[in-house]
Amino acid sequence: MKSRHACTILLLMSIPAMSVVAAETIRFATFNTSLNRNKAGALQEELEGGNSVQARKIAQILQRVRPDVVLLNEVDYDSSGKTVQLFRQQYLEVSQGNQPPLHYQHTFLAPVNTGIPSGIDLDRNGETGQPGDAFGFGRFPGQYGMLVLSRYPIDEKRARTFQKFPWKKMPGALLPVDPSSSEPYYPAEAVGVFRLSSKSHWDVPIQAGENMIHLLASHPTPPVFDGPEDRNGRRNHDEIRLWADYIRPSRSNYLVDDHGQRGGLARGAHFVIAGDMNADPLDGDTVPGAIGQLLDQRKVNSRQIPASTGAVAFRDTGANADHRGSARNDTADFPDQGPGNLRVDYVLPSRSLRVLESGVFWPPAGEPASALLDASDHRLVWVDVTFK
């Protein structure tokens, strides 16, 4: 298949083409599946034969919620697309827990920065070639990758990726400073090659009848695992900021994608921002206001907050007791000793779309579906939208 993308973007269509009837409602979702392994090829090997317990649970969750378009975070990337095919054909398209099989005719897959060596000692531990020295933390290229599945056609020719965008090119970038010297934390050689995106930022155009919706997909770095310089917190902030600038024509001219196209979304374009943003609006360790760059943006429809009853019951002791945010909006079950459960996964439509319903897949303890929750420490978040 020909593609203008040199970075091996795959539009996989192993299923015969099937028309999607224009529907009044489109369900978008994001789900950090934790389908990552510590060795390249290990996930693909595990998926062979359809017997992975974790993957079967992930597939059943998807079959229960049945999103039309879903971003999956933390699915190890392989350039052949074999891992995706195995998950789709041997898990999603096979009934799990008596749920109807789920078919996605369109898949978007592209490389990510995790595990790609930078050649520089980025974490300043005296060694190079370690996971913390990659452009995004990872033990091999593609660990913690991303994947988009869609019932609606994907306009591959108009898809854009920002995997290689340099952090220093962002005006006013929050590049870290060494508090002990007030000097830049990263040496000039590191700043010269440092990529903003810890995985990647994708603009995936979804063709819904005569309308186009841009799925803006990413997975910013966790704002922890660093020191007083807060290098990961600052990067997380600016990874989120990329989308806040991208959706505003007056702020996006500095952005250049991996194929040299400048600028962001056209004025009036429909979009849905999705992903594990690793940022809670009130709690956790993020730079203050990080996710507010999106939640408070007038182009974003963020009033209806996805919620669940199960999350309330999971609000245990420890760090959760001091949280300011409502437990019903949490999307991740993190350790009680810290940071506690947080709202870090988002599906944020543009105001040009009408939000009908939303939710978080977090069934209360005791319900049969609660047995699926140990498949990941994150919960699937979904939002139903329609055109105004």
Write out the residue ranges for each language-model feature.
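Bacterial N-terminal signal peptides that target proteins for export
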Residues: M1-I9
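N-terminal, active-site-proximal structural segment of metallo-dependent hydrolase catalytic domains
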Residues: V21-V148, L174-F194, G209-I213, D226-P228, ...
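Conserved hydrophobic/aromatic positions in well-ordered beta-strands
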Residues: L147-S150, W202-P205, L216, Y346-V347
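Metal-dependent phosphoester-hydrolase catalytic domains
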Residues: P153-T161, F165-P171, P205-I206, N232-I273, ...
